[in-house]
Curated annotation (Swiss-Prot):
Record-stated family: Belongs to the EPSP synthase family.
Protein's name according to its UniProt entry: 3-phosphoshikimate 1-carboxyvinyltransferase
Source species taxonomy: Bacteria, Pseudomonadati, Pseudomonadota, Gammaproteobacteria, Alteromonadales
Major enzyme class: transferase
Localisation per UniProt entry: Cytoplasm
Main localization, broad class: cytoplasm
GO BP of this protein: amino acid biosynthetic process; aromatic amino acid family biosynthetic process; chorismate biosynthetic process
Organism name: Shewanella sp. (strain ANA-3)
Length: 426
């Protein structure tokens, strides 16, 4: 197994242009596919999850051209639904942002589609989405365990009508349903059951749908009306914002050991909720400066926080390791959906934080972290989870440094993360 040793870093400074957002990249690729016209996507993320989406679209007959560095994609839309005369089997790795929306989109047309993935994907729930699609007439069969991939879709189109969907596990289910609703045979009325997690990710979805010319009436996130007879129309060009979750590591670095770290590609005008991570750093004591398309973090003594971070679940992971450098006990609450991500992130985070000496309480949907007087070096297991690897890079700011196991797992969203991280040394 590959290992990466991070030696202690005394101070950081620099500027990082953040790669494109995974969430925006895969949503925009699917909407461009369903749209009329040709769409040019710039600053597209070049990573495993996006490659799985692109490979599947190509297999389904979608035509596109990629630039040499894979960050500009010119895609010719189908002007409607995806259909296939032959049975198709699509392998989607561990890409939830490809599996969930494609599962929904493939019910719209005609054909037989089987969706598979890596072993971890078979442990990531999709039942809430499938239940909702079945209410609109979809024919979907599980091939192994009920509620989980792999699955086969026998597509004949989606009916309109009223549909209930659970919102308390993952916002990706609602996102997938929203994106396909305009192409159903009648108007769709979506009722959200339970607390809606990761609400800002729904805002990303709605903003992109509007960019492609579709209207959704949002009744305070409890009900969504999608009128029938709409069509996605390419806006011509779509600029993919930098990934705000990826920005969190560099902003935390600036807060802990700045110097001054500037991230570009996200800022005040971002449609991503994860930019609010910078507000949490500010609450902890960091000096934060906002521009329209940049954020600067400067170092200051950090103090612990006790916050509900349901709205920024991915970026909240970075607070867990930043807490090692804050005075007091940090509590991150309402984050049950960490458990159904690339790994059970609550269990994994608790295990690895204890290795470096932290006192950790792992609850059903919260984690509490008290840093030790002196941090220990350790070998950090990453669980094939890109965010675990990136979060624990913060341990480079301890006097002992850290060893990261399987550092290449960052290829899911940020293949050259550690090279960029190393560039910050003052």
């Amino acid at each position: 197994m590959k290992q990466l040793r991070l030696e202690p870093v005394v101070q950081v400074r620099g500027e990082i242009n953040i790669p494109g957002s995974k969430s925006i990249s895969n949503r925009a690729l699917l909407l461009a596919t369903l749209a009329k016209g040709t769409t040019t996507l710039t600053n597209l993320l070049d990573s495993d999850d996006i490659r799985h989406m692109l490979a599947s679209l190509k297999q389904l007959g979608v035509e596109y051209r990629l630039s040499q560095n894979n960050t500009v994609c010119e895609l010719t839309g189908l002007g409607g639904v995806i259909s296939s005369d032959t049975a198709q089997t699509l392998f989607l790795g561990n890409a939830g942002t490809a599996m969930r929306p494609l599962c929904a989109a493939l019910t719209l047309g005609r054909g037989e589609f089987t969706l598979t993935g890596e072993p971890r994907m078979e442990e990531r729930p999709i039942g809430d989405l499938v239940d909702a699609l079945k209410q609109l007439g979809a024919n979907i069969v599980y091939l192994k365990n009920d509620g989980f991939p792999p699955l086969t879709i026998n597509a004949t189109g989606l009916n309109g009508g009223d549909v209930e969907i659970a919102g308390d596990l993952s916002s990706q289910f609602l996102t997938a349903l929203l994106m396909v609703a305009p192409l159903a045979k009648g108007s769709v009325n979506i009722h959200v059951k339970g607390e809606l997690v990761s609400k800002p990710y729904i805002d990303i979805t709605l903003a992109l749908m509007a960019q492609f010319g579709v209207q959704v009436i949002n009744h305070d996130y409890a009900r969504f009306e999608i009128p029938a007879g709409q069509q996605y129309v390419s806006p011509g060009k779509v600029l993919v914002e930098g990934d705000a979750s990826s920005a969190s590591y560099f902003l935390a670095a600036g807060a802990i050991k700045g110097g001054e770290v500037k991230v570009t590609g996200v800022g005040r005008l971002s449609i991503q909720g994860d930019v609010k991570f910078a507000d949490v750093l500010e609450k902890m004591g960091a000096d934060i400066e906002w521009g329209d398309d940049y954020i600067i973090a400067r170092g200051a003594p950090l103090t612990a926080v006790d916050l509900d971070m349901n709205h920024i679940p991915d970026a909240a992971m970075t607070i867990a390791t930043a807490a090692l450098f804050a005075k007091g006990t940090t509590t991150i609450r309402n984050i049950y959906n960490w458990r159904i991500k690339e790994t059970d992130r609550l269990a994994a985070m608790a295990t690895e934080l204890r290795k470096v000496g932290a006192l950790v309480e792992e609850g059903h949907d919260y984690i509490q972290i008290t840093p030790p007087v002196v941090l220990n070096t350790a070998e950090i297991d990453t669980y094939n989870d890109h965010r675990m690897a990136m979060c624990f890079s913060m341990m480079a700011f301890a006097d002992c440094g850290i060893t990261i196991n399987d550092p290449d797992c960052t290829s899911k969203t940020f293949p050259d993360y550690f090279a960029q991280f190393a560039s910050l040394k003052a």
